[in-house]
Amino acid sequence: MKGDFGDSVVNKVYEYRVLRRMSQKELADAVGVSKQTIFVMEKNNYSPSLVLALRIANYFEVDINEIFFYVRKDETND
């Protein structure tokens, strides 16, 4: 299908949250989303908006590129 690239954004939200010994609910409250949003994001089943990705990176005091990664479809089909 034209325009369906299949690219994705993967993340290390789980790793950063666990290092801080935080629950999903605590992180969700800190960045203004639901616990379910954090859950699906950690499973890489949801790509956050740029604003949410920036909020999360800011919360953990790291560059957005430390947590979120753009992956092209052809890079995942090795």
Model-derived regions, located:
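Short amphipathic helical patch at the helix-1/turn junction of helix-turn-helix
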Residues: 7, 17-19, 47
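Short, charged recognition helix plus adjacent turn
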Residues: 1-4, 68-78
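Recognition helix of helix-turn-helix/homeodomain-like DNA-binding domains
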Residues: 33-46
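Residues in the helix-turn-helix
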Residues: 26, 37, 66
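Short basic helix-loop element that most often maps to the first helix and adjoining turn
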Residues: 11-30
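DNA major-groove recognition helix of helix-turn-helix/homeodomain DNA-binding modules
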Residues: 51-66
